């Protein structure tokens, strides 16, 4: 099929020129890095046949908006990472594993913050209370954010969570026991991290 390399229901590679793309209904899995680096891809229609979106499937694409159907049960790491034009992610309300809030992607129970839409123009973001994990590459490539705050409920901040956020200057981590990956701020060693030591004291790292 033109523009798509499909093997046994898996979309292995997109070979087209971008723009608005409709994925064929014969596809059940969007493979790892299938659209990686497709800067001219602005819109994609994911059919109800798709159950899995692989790691880095749309990494560094030109997507402006993406809609995830109810059929998708697994989204791999950094599937929509470093999409610097992406302003909103929506999830079908009948999806059992994922949901969206304010255009960002979460696990259905709201405990894992999976992906911030990196093209948003807001300069501040407060991770909602109840989130326990800030996921792999969650804020990767955000252009406009200067300040982010994570609540006491956050237990883990994973690899590359704030990687290459070009405007980021401060991250406030309110959980005194929050585990922060050594790679969470990869490429941004100059970010000021404010960590809660106890209820009355902050320290600057």
Give names to the regions the model predicted.
Residues 1-7, 15-29, 39-52, 61-74, ...:
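Structural signature of tandem-repeat unit edges
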Residues 13, 184-186:
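Short, conserved catalytic or adaptor-binding loops enriched in Gly and charged residues
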């Amino acid at each position: 099929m033109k523009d798509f390399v499909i093997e046994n229901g898996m979309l292995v590679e997109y070979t087209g020129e971008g723009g608005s793309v409709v994925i064929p209904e014969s596809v059940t899995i969007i493979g790892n890095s299938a659209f990686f680096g497709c800067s001219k891809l602005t819109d994609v229609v994911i059919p109800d046949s798709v159950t899995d979106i692989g790691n880095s499937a749309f990494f560094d694409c030109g997507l402006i908006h993406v809609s995830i159907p109810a059929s998708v049960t697994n989204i791999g790491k950094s599937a929509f990472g470093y999409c610097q034009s992406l302003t909103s992610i929506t999830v079908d309300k009948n999806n059992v594993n994922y949901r969206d809030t304010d255009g960002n992607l979460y696990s259905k129970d709201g405990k894992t913050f999976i992906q911030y839409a990196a093209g948003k123009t807001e300069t501040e973001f407060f991770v909602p209370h109840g989130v326990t994990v800030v996921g792999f590459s969650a804020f990767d490539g955000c252009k406009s954010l200067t300040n982010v705050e994570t609540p006491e409920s956050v237990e883990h901040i994973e690899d590359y969570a704030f990687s290459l956020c070009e405007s980021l200057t401060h991250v406030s981590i309110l959980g005194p026991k929050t585990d922060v990956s050594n790679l969470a701020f990869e490429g941004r060693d100059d970010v000021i991290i404010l960590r809660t030591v106890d209820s009355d004291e902050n320290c600057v790292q």
